[in-house]
Amino acid sequence: MNRTNQLILGAVVLGSTLLAGCSSNAKIDQLSSDVQTLSAKVEQLSNDVNAMRSDVQAAKDDAARANQRLDNKVFRICK
């Protein structure tokens, strides 16, 4: 996901550079502002994904502990 976002950001920067020859300064400034906004959004999404990773790992750990407790109970009953 991060690589895809970098490619998109690179395409936006490249596109704005190519358009610089036939654009006014106001349009260039607007594109630059848009790129900065997109960069901030990409960074926020990356932070959100990283936060979710730790939550997912915690949920996996809880599920593994619950499954182990169930396995232990079944083993005792069958014993």
UniProtKB/Swiss-Prot annotation:
Coiled coil (UniProt feature): 28-69
InterPro entries: Lipoprotein_leucine-zipper_dom (IPR006817), MOM_Lpp (IPR016367)
Source superkingdom: Bacteria
Keywords in alphabetical order: Cell outer membrane, Cell wall, Coiled coil, Lipoprotein, Membrane, Palmitate, Peptidoglycan-anchor, Repeat, Secreted, Signal, Virulence
GO BP terms, alphabetized: lipid modification; periplasmic space organization
SUPFAM superfamilies according to UniProt: Outer membrane lipoprotein (SSF58042)
GO CC annotations, alphabetized: cell outer membrane; extracellular region
Pfam family, one: LPP
Sites of N6-murein peptidoglycan lysine modification: K79
Induction: This gene is probably poorly expressed.
Endoplasmic reticulum recorded as keyword: no
Subcellular location: Cell outer membrane; Secreted, Cell wall
Signal peptide (from-to): 1-21
Main location: membrane
Sites of S-diacylglycerol cysteine lipidation: C22
Claim: Signal is one of the keywords in the record: yes
Membrane-related topology note: Lipid-anchor; Peptidoglycan-anchor
Lipid-carrying residues in chain (N-palmitoyl cysteine): C22
Single annotated GO MF: lipid binding
Chain's role: Plays an important role in virulence. A highly abundant outer membrane lipoprotein that controls the distance between the inner and outer membranes. The only protein known to be covalently linked to the peptidoglycan network (PGN). Also non-covalently binds the PGN. The link between the cell outer membrane and PGN contributes to maintenance of the structural and functional integrity of the cell envelope, and maintains the correct distance between the PGN and the outer membrane.
NCBIfam families, alphabetized: Ala_zip_lipo (NF040598), PRK15396.1 (NF011925)
Binding partners and assembly: Homotrimer.
Protein name as catalogued: Major outer membrane lipoprotein Lpp 2
Source organism of the structure: Salmonella typhimurium (strain LT2 / SGSC1412 / ATCC 700720)
Gene designation per UniProt: lpp2
